[in-house]
């Protein structure tokens, strides 16, 4: 018996209410329509996404496996066994590309261990969209995920990153945007560092700007509570 394939399915990165099919390549819809088993970070939002790209999608005939930070090993084993038994499985994050700062990473690792073919599909990645529009170093960069929640640890992490090591990329929970921004402005060297703030990418409130720290210190910038990528070099 041939093993199934693990399809990595990107989903829109902007607000769900702003869904626009132009961000979904036609071939992606075609691939999704072939699947009836999914491993997802949020079952409710995944079901809504499937209905939006295809109102006739057979949701009731579809199996959803939840993969989040609380998922136990037994559930991952169930998904891998499903693939070994010849079923294709689609992986969806709650936003953007699965496998990057996302529980899909563990599933991919397990699939490689079992020699299961992984098929990454093309779609929106907030990290790459932010970097490509930042004007900062796109040749050498590091994605750090989230900065520490505690202020002291966050400041220590910011100061630790040397300016000659390329671009440093962070994501943040929207309600902490302002705290992170304030710490960056106060602790990055104003004469040599630049900061890009990319907010609500592909959404109606999209905002992308890159300025020197010295310039930003002269502005009273208040960040709204939208998904945001921070990049500095």
PLM segments and residue spans:
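Short glycine-rich anion-binding loops that position phosphate/pyrophosphate groups of nucleotides
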Residues: 13-16, 94-98, 174-176, 201-203
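Short active-site oxyanion
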Residues: 32-38, 115-119, 167-168
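Conserved helicase motor
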Residues: 65-72, 146-150
């Amino acid at each position: 018996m041939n093993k199934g394939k693990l399809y990595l399915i990107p989903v829109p990165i902007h607000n769900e209410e702003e869904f626009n099919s132009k961000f979904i390549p036609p071939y992606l819809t075609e691939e999704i329509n072939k699947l009836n088993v999914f491993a997802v970070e949020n079952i409710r939002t995944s079901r809504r996404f499937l209905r939006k790209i295809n109102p006739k999608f057979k949701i009731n005939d579809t199996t959803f496996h939840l993969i989040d930070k609380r998922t136990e090993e037994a559930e991952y084993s169930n998904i891998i066994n499903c693939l070994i038994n010849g079923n294709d499985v689609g992986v969806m994050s709650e936003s953007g590309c699965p496998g990057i700062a996302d529980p899909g990473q563990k599933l991919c690792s397990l699939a490689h261990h079992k020699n299961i073919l992984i098929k990454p599909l093309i779609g929106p990645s907030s990290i790459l969209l932010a970097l490509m529009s930042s004007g900062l170093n796109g040749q050498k960069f590091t994605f750090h995920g989230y900065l520490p929640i505690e202020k002291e640890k966050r400041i220590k992490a910011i100061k630790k990153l040397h300016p000659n090591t390329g671009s440093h990329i962070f994501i943040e929970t929207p309600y902490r945007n302002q705290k992170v921004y304030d710490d960056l402005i106060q602790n990055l060297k104003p004469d040599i560092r630049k900061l890009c703030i990319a907010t609500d990418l592909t959404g109606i409130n999209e905002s992308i700007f890159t300025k020197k720290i010295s310039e930003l210190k002269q502005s009273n910038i208040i960040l709204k509570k939208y998904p945001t990528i921070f990049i500095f070099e």
